[in-house]
UniProtKB/Swiss-Prot annotation:
Residues modified by glycosylation: N102, N141
Gene name linked to the record: IL1A
Keywords of the record: Acetylation, Cytokine, Cytoplasm, Glycoprotein, Inflammatory response, Mitogen, Nucleus, Phosphoprotein, Pyrogen, Secreted
Annotated InterPro entries: IL-1_alpha (IPR003295), IL-1_CS (IPR020877), IL-1_fam (IPR000975), IL-1_propep (IPR003502), IL1/FGF (IPR008996)
One GO term of the biological process aspect: fever generation
Function: Cytokine constitutively present intracellularly in nearly all resting non-hematopoietic cells that plays an important role in inflammation and bridges the innate and adaptive immune systems. After binding to its receptor IL1R1 together with its accessory protein IL1RAP, forms the high affinity interleukin-1 receptor complex. Signaling involves the recruitment of adapter molecules such as MYD88, IRAK1 or IRAK4. In turn, mediates the activation of NF-kappa-B and the three MAPK pathways p38, p42/p44 and JNK pathways.
Entry GO MF terms: copper ion binding; cytokine activity; interleukin-1 receptor binding
Higher taxonomy: Eukaryota, Metazoa, Chordata, Craniata, Vertebrata
GO CC annotations, alphabetized: cytosol; extracellular space; nucleus
Modified residues (N6-acetyllysine): K82
Propeptide: 1-112
Subunit structure as annotated in this protein's UniProt entry: Monomer. Interacts with TMED10; the interaction mediates the translocation from the cytoplasm into the ERGIC (endoplasmic reticulum-Golgi intermediate compartment) and thereby secretion. Interacts with IL1R1. Interacts with S100A13; this interaction is the first step in the export of IL1A, followed by direct translocation of this complex across the plasma membrane.
Protein name: Interleukin-1 alpha
Domain of life: Eukaryota
Length: 268
């Protein structure tokens, strides 16, 4: 686990150096206080290595933080609705999954001092299937279907929804992310939707089995977001890009208009 530098130890050193320097200058008042002479109190042993809430009265007393994340559900008025810490050892309920996907006022508190390599070294562990044999319709009421030209998807208006591709949505969880990552697998197959670069078609990638842990194959993962009645699938590997449709174009990755990134999940 990465260790947060003890900033207050640095302050103590600066304070000591500053006072030594001041003693050598005759014209400075002996009563003058150092810039670093703040009202910091030493940490008690029982506070070390513990996660503490950071309000105004406590920020000066905390020197080490845990790298577990808190998810804070906040109402539009600013009132905290729900606060919880996500851990691989916790049981996540259906309500939790819906809240994470659906709550547009969710605020993620992340450790700011973590090194990039620490944050990017994320393992996603399989949680469970949350949708089976569902259909994805875009905002133009087009359904996703297989494209005959290769391992691709396209969107079309269907009179018979039985012709649409059926997807299983599988949820994953990690200690570093508080959003809800999912995979989209074509039902009764091992073909997974795989994100590519912007404007490139998504691929249907065959896997030997449903991955129990995803570490390097993050192209298979999408953060499922729900806003009102619409669903969005943001790439974990390319976090500015969403699964999208466009007239006369294969299903691809896009950041927004003119491509359509809004979908509805239709249950079987």
């Amino acid at each position: 686990m990465a260790k947060v530098p003890d900033l207050f130890e640095d302050l103590k050193n600066c304070y000591s150096e500053n006072e030594d320097y001041s003693s050598e200058i005759d014209h400075l008042s002996l009563n003058q206080k150092s810039f670093y002479d703040a009202s910091y109190e030493p940490l008690r042993e029982d506070q070390m290595d513990k996660f503490m809430s950071l309000d105004t009265s406590e920020t000066s007393k905390t020197s080490r933080l845990s790298f577990k994340e808190n998810v804070v559900m906040v109402a539009a008025s600013g009132k905290i609705l729900k606060k919880r810490r996500l851990s691989l050892n916790q049981f996540i309920t259906d309500d939790d999954l819906e809240a994470i996907a659906n709550n547009t006022e969710e605020e993620i508190i992340k450790p700011r001092s973590a090194h990039y390599s620490f944050q990017s070294n994320v393992k996603y562990n399989l949680l469970r299937v949350i949708h089976q044999e569902c259909i994805l319709n875009d905002a133009l009421n087009q359904s996703l279907i297989r494209d005959l030209s290769g391992p691709y998807l396209t969107a079309a208006t269907l009179n018979n929804l039985e012709e649409a591709v059926k997807f299983d949505m599988v949820a994953y969880v990690s200690e570093e992310d508080s959003q809800l990552p999912v995979t989209l697998r074509i039902s009764k197959t091992q073909l997974f939707v795989s994100a590519q670069n912007e404007d490139e078609p998504v691929l249907l990638k065959e896997m030997p089995e449903t991955p129990k842990i995803i570490k390097d194959e993050t192209n298979l993962l999408f953060f499922w977001e729900k806003h009102g009645s619409m669903d969005y699938f943001k790439s974990v590997a390319h976090p500015k890009l969403f699964i999208a449709t466009k007239q006369e174009k294969l299903v691809h990755m896009a950041s927004g208009p003119p491509s359509v990134t809004d979908f509805q999940i239709l249950e079987k």
